[in-house]
Amino acid sequence: MEFKRCSGILMPISSLPGGYGIGSMGKPAHDFVDFLAKAGQTIWQILPVGPTGYADSPYQSCSAFAGNPYFIDLDLLAADGLLTKKDYAAINWGGDAAHVDYGTLYEKRFAVLRKAYANFLKKRPVPGYETPYPDDWYRFRFLSSDWLPDYCLYMAIKEANGMVDWQQWPRALRVREPEALAEFKAEHAGEIEFWAFLQYEFDRQWRALHAYAKEKGVAIMGDIPIYVAADSADAWAGRELFETDAEGKPRRVAGCPPDYFAADGQLW
């Protein structure tokens, strides 16, 4: 079998230059695709694009399927009428443009995204009614139905419990008692939908970026973590798929021994 030789550059989306604290899938990403094409490169290698948690690592994500809301481009949301420039342009996203301040992002980015969600609610379609915006909302929900509901519920519960590990949630929610979940869904329906909105917007921008890269002859080569994280929607919603104890904690873990980069070794 013959393979065509090709070359490219590794550039995490988070490392793209931008004015709002972290790289995004808008102009910064499209400009980088243009740079690759002009340089004769045909591959853009990225790191995993899943949501990051307290460790701020793309290899420790709370979902094997969801996208990182931090990568949603605010200017594109503004272009869609979901934000105005004054909603985010004057915010201090961190004092060092060369580094991502994840603490600041967590405190300020979601507040801006909630403004976008509030404006989205004024436009989103209502089942049974004719509306021009947006037809792909339901299509996305349908195509993501095997993971999105559990992820959104997980994030809403996590938010309501101070973002602690799901193994520290109230037992009824931790073990997914039907009555407890039904009660939580009824009381936090708006919060659950907020997390669905973020994934919808991520998906729209991600697909647009892929299409643009393909048009320019650039393939995006991704990466994924070796394991699903213990503190994830996947582990919480699919405990039967994992070897855990009665509390949901992994019975066995893996990693690698100490080396030059990690004196204490790594626990994956």
Briefly describe each language-model feature range.
Residues 2, 27-52:
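Catalytic domains of carbohydrate-active enzymes, especially glycoside hydrolases
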Residues 7-11, 42-45, 220-222:
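Hydrophobic faces of well-ordered beta-strands that scaffold small-molecule active sites
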Residues 16-27:
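Active-site mouth loops of central-metabolism enzymes
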Residues 36, 46, 154, 213, ...:
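Conserved, mostly hydrophobic/aromatic
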Residues 45-55, 224-230:
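Short, solvent-exposed turn/loop segments enriched in Gly/Ser/Thr/Pro and often Arg
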